[in-house]
Amino acid sequence: MKMTSKKMKDELMKKLSRPEWDFQYDSEKEVLRIEQKDSKKGINVSLPGVVAKWEVNKEKAIEEVAYYVQEALIAMHKEENSTAKILPVIRSTSFPKQAEEGNPFIMTDHTAETRIYYALDSNKTYRLIDERLLQKLGLTEQQVREMALFNARSLGYEFKQDTVAGNTFYFLNTNDGYDATRILNESLLQSMREKISGDMVVAVPHQDVLIIADIVNEIGYDIIAQMTMKFFAEGHVPITSLSFVYEDGDFEPIFILAKNRKKTDGKEKG
């Protein structure tokens, strides 16, 4: 049979078919590109050159090119993952539990309103870890959780501060994608607890903000409720409009509206 660039493209695509790789064919330049779906890194194969080799070596030429492409892409993937970090991310409990049907994300319960997911972050790409990715990484769920919490503790923090009606509010907003993640840093929470004189209230309205408040009066509770609702509405990745009282390592959701309603009802009765 006569081999053409189009036929060679079809042969190589059959040999290199993998769910994590994509193909792009430029018919004008007669170039087939094979790339990783996640990182978009890949290899360009000039098909006329492969056809010329096929004229001499037949099937062996196709095998050699396929082997070269496969090894190069696998090496790229390993290099990328070797520099990648696993970090926890906070999401709402309404966030999807599966990447797709039959492929659940790796998750850990956090509060009544929030859940912990895990991200593989290589600076350029960011992907939530699901069971299939977990297998590719060759890690257990427990290893992922331990690595993620360790890396979360290494995230820096510098709060901006504001005081209203005697209540002090501390804001963390670095926009690194992991501001809400700092809620998992127990030593950070303990150090803030030591400097707070009233109730310690914590909020993660969206991915890119962590609010810690020193609440000393009812006005403070009203302010944190309004503030959290505003941030929640504005966030690209909203998490929860509720804030939490932090005490002895536990987070208790504050149902501000119910609290205010009871207060109002009491005044009306009196």
Curated annotation (Swiss-Prot):
Q: Which Pfam families match?
A: DUF1444
List residues traversing the bilayer: none
Name the source's superkingdom: Bacteria
Regarding protein family, the annotation reads: Belongs to the UPF0354 family.
Q: What is this protein called?
A: UPF0354 protein BALH_4267
Please give the organism. Answer: Bacillus thuringiensis (strain Al Hakam)
Lineage runs: Bacteria, Bacillati, Bacillota, Bacilli, Bacillales
